[in-house]
Amino acid sequence: MKGLVFVGLNKIEIQERPKPLIVEPTDGIIKLAKTTICGSDLHILKGHVPRVPFGRIMGHEGLGTVDAVGASVTRFKPGDRVIISTMTKCGRCEFCAQGMYSHCADGGWTLGNTVDGTQAEYTRVRHADDEDALVMASCMLPTGMECGVLSGRVRPGCRVAIVGAGPIGLSALMSAQLYSPSVIIMLDLDPARLEAGRRLGAMHAVLSGPHAVEEVMRITDGKGVDTAIEAVGSPPTFELCQELIGVGGTIANIGIHGGKVDLHMDKLWDRNITITTRMLDTFATGKLLELLKAGKINGKALATHSFHFNDIITAYDTFAAAAANHALKVIVDFENPGRENARL
């Protein structure tokens, strides 16, 4: 089979690899139909996730068809159409008992990390209908909801700022609207992404720059926001969240940070501020699937480009230069070469 392999810092290539086999009785082999490229894949290429070794097949999101199952698997059978959860869980360890599936002693974030991932024709590892929308439930939409909206304690009537209008920030935007905040402010350096935020429901779109804090304070009558969601993973955006947060507020970090950031305790120590960090645990995936199928969330709105798997390196180049290409989520299709390089 073909797979996209991490061969060195900022280097990937398509290689021929053996088709995966059932190893444990709980395993399933999935023939991929679609996968996507995540911001965390770019962090891996830059060396920001050092536990990922050279030689690893990339990817942790996907949708496909069950090819084979182990002897203990009873809920799925060959031929079933399924989505692949980013996180796997044993259901028995102390972390699973607490719902912290991302830290499962025998699972967690394994695909494209500690085991070969989903950017291949087959992978070793939920029932799902518009597949470009449903593939978003593998990782992106639950990350926005769990790590941003729920950790950030978004609630009716609160004021929310989302710093970063990329796929994860826009996912948080769509989830936040389910909780009826009074204000949602989107901040980004890219006017095109801010316009995407407006289309998807942001009440205000603020261009990041020297006057961004002043504008947010004007919108919030000088109070700041109750929830600041950091959806980039950089020192300037974490700094901005600290400037936007109001008394008693929560800064919810989603972004993957490849380096240190400054924490201004001299300004925050007496303001009852909460800062949260977490990994995706996928407990919201089932709820999001129902919302997608009911049309309450438009996951397909985030898919801007589609490539056939044979052109996945071009897909990476497109996603890495997202601003220049007006790219949000890039779909990689294994089944339909007729959609090659389409702009959705």
For the regions a language model picked out, list residue spans one by one.
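Glycine-rich cofactor phosphate-binding loops and adjacent beta1-alpha1 units
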Residues: 150-156, 195-274, 313, 339-340
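Mid-domain Rossmann-like dinucleotide-binding core that forms the NAD(H)/NADP(H) cofactor-binding site
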Residues: 130-210, 214
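NAD(P)H dinucleotide-binding glycine-rich loop of Rossmann-like/cofactor-binding domains
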Residues: 90-163
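Rossmann-fold dehydrogenase core element
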Residues: 250-252, 262-302
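Glycine-rich beta-strand-centered segment in the early N-terminal region that forms part
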Residues: 20-35, 48-94, 129
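Residue-level recognition of short, solvent-exposed, well-ordered loop/turn junctions
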Residues: 23-24, 77, 142, 155, ...
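Conserved acidic E/D residue at the C-terminus of a beta-strand in Rossmann-like folds
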Residues: 188, 255, 279
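C-terminal hydrophobic helical "lid"/dimerization subdomain
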Residues: 191, 239-243, 282-344
